[in-house]
UniProtKB/Swiss-Prot annotation:
It catalyses: D-sedoheptulose 7-phosphate + D-glyceraldehyde 3-phosphate = D-erythrose 4-phosphate + beta-D-fructose 6-phosphate. Homodimer. It is found in: Cytoplasm. The active site is at 132 (schiff-base intermediate with substrate). The gene is talB. This is Transaldolase. One of its GO terms (molecular function) is transaldolase activity. Its EC number is 2.2.1.2. Its main location: cytoplasm. It holds the Pfam family TAL_FSA.
Amino acid sequence: MTDKLTSLRQYTTVVADTGDIAAMKLYQPQDATTNPSLILNAAQIPEYRKLIDDAVAWAKQQSNDRAQQIVDATDKLAVNIGLEILKLVPGRISTEVDARLSYDTEASIAKAKRLIKLYNDAGISNDRILIKLASTWQGIRAAEQLEKEGINCNLTLLFSFAQARACAEAGVFLISPFVGRILDWYKANTDKKEYAPAEDPGVVSVSEIYQYYKEHGYETVVMGASFRNIGEILELAGCDRLTIAPTLLKELAESEGAIERKLSYTGEVKARPARITESEFLWQHNQDPMAVDKLAEGIRKFAIDQEKLEKMIGDLL
């Protein structure tokens, strides 16, 4: 009897949404994704202490300025954790640009290149790295430029169709539409508190994006993220990739039974619309109160965890 995780792998590339190396060894995902919150959590794991110490020692060699040392050590720690994960996954690691740069295209590009250089200096080629950027207009423009320079990007905190469309038109490598956080918003802001997986608003959003991309021939990878239960995951079987937290990977691995493919596209490829303009993007995104709330909240939360990480690093300098 097969388990649901093995069955899911027939249709979808499974990615681990964690910085926990023990979980990588256990579930053997193709790729892994990290973010400031996951890096902060990983930094509390005793086995990672040597990675922190290395980042701090390295930063001290780069500059005598304490503020710069904190920035350097934080970047180096994210890359050090990524390097450990890359020993265990055959595919790619996603490493996130500082969320406080989400509205600054040039600063985002500079930070992305900095992270890439740290990986390259450690012997990792660009084809094993994805740079994560928030799906703001500025983040999408940064990704468009980085893609032209051979740096593949993962556009995260994606909640609206306008964001998804702009990402595809920018030619970004991959998007991470957030399923569970969409569900959270609808539960908190509407009278409906329970949703069957097929009508879960996060599942519906990702399904619509997947269909739109396939029917217009966009090559941007759709990677569903931020799951609250395995029902959401099973409804998206067939999505290009799904990034899943270890607790849900465990639940899938311990659940018996084959699953059926839910997402696929076999129709003809249609003509693409004209590119969305900045004003159209901002207006359409603004028309979706869930997306407005969740994008802003996500950026704030990642920024808070980035600052906590920097404080932890600062205390060690």
